[in-house]
Amino acid sequence: MTALASLLVAATVAANPFEKPGLPAYLWNQPEPVNLPELLVTAAGERVVSSAAWERVRRPEILKLFEDCVYGRRPVGRPDGLAFADEAPEKTMMDGRAIRRQVAISFKAPKGEGVIHALAFLPIAEKPTPSFVLICNRPRAKNLDPERMTRTEFWPAEEIVSRGYAAIAFYYEDVAPDRYDGFASGVYPLYGDPAARTETDWGALSAWAWGASRVMDWIETEPRLDAKAVAVIGHSRGGKTSLWAGATDTRFALTCVNDSGCGGARLNHLLLSNAETIGFLRGAQPHWMCAAWGRWGGRELDAPFDQHQLMALVAPRLLAVGSASRDMGAGPYGEYLSAKLASPAWELYGRRGLVSAAFPKAGEARQEGSLSYHLRAGEHDLKLSDWNRYMDFFDRSQKK
């Protein structure tokens, strides 16, 4: 337990940010992290004091740790035969403010072919625009309507475009199914034998994050988009996915992680009653991670990894973490503390991480550094107010 974490716990208890009656007591009586793995100490026991040492030694160590123990090893990076084709003619929409593109991102694999369908609304602008890529884990018909007859706050494309960003999304099950028995379909059988999976083979979250990188491949070919200013965003299991996407693909300038909980932003070594654990997800969603992750179920405090280390892989790029005050399963304070404990990685580059003296109250945000955190009042969801927080944060970097 570090002195920093002790101070954070004390500040949180004193601040008591959750004042509404009826909420579980754990929200204002936080336990301390136990056996927290070191961020800036190498496997050989050497302290990391420079960005060069971080990139040369410690960052690769942490990346491999999460590949082997959490998300699994990908059998492929950028695939062969990658191609992009319009599935419908371009169309001017949103009262003349945007161009719609529907793009088939196809690829060839040793055992077949695959395709990811991307939907994009590009602002009509004089110069290339920044963009947000949503990993959509909610029904396509309701949330990704290309005609915009059906709209939701989950993907508020009109509002995104009005802020000067391209709104881009893909449906996660284009890449891999979201079910425990889905390894015989999607991308998995294209690159391996589903009947001969090992404990370190990639799980669904890694496959979905791989899909986000393929959308990024397309963005790099679209001259109306600024490929140096792309944010990846996801909610819940999509938030777990966006964090892994941002950690593994340095082309994403901003990584937005919304209500992601265990396996996403929340610390495993912080025991919170009513919050997801590795043991719970091992039984409820065994396909999300590699099989090796499950060995830490019920032994979370012994795990040699934790999510502050994963967050640090995004440094020195931008990272934004969002929580909801009533999202007990995700464990908001654990998400906040993870971001705080990841901040020293940004400091190696002479940048500030999360600038915050205490856990914010519901409705507040901390966005002064390169790492943003906000706490929305409400339930587990991705709302327009969350999007506005993420766009506000990205706006600041666009103006520099």
Set out the residue ranges of the language-model regions.
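Conserved strand-to-loop "acid loop" that flanks and positions the catalytic carboxylate
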Residues: 315-332, 376-378
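Cap/lid segment of the alpha/beta-hydrolase catalytic domain
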Residues: 127, 132-224, 261-270
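Primarily recognizes the serine-hydrolase "nucleophile elbow" in alpha/beta-hydrolase
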Residues: 139, 143-145, 213-276, 284, ...
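N-terminal pre-domain segments of enzymes
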Residues: 11-73
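Mobile cap/lid helix-loop segments that gate and shape the active-site cleft of serine hydrolases
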Residues: 187, 257-310, 335-356
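C-terminal catalytic histidine-bearing segment of alpha/beta-hydrolase fold enzymes
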Residues: 293, 340-400
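Conserved alpha/beta-hydrolase "acid-adjacent" motif
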Residues: 328-338, 383-386
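N-terminal cap/lid segment of alpha/beta-hydrolase-fold proteins
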Residues: 73-131
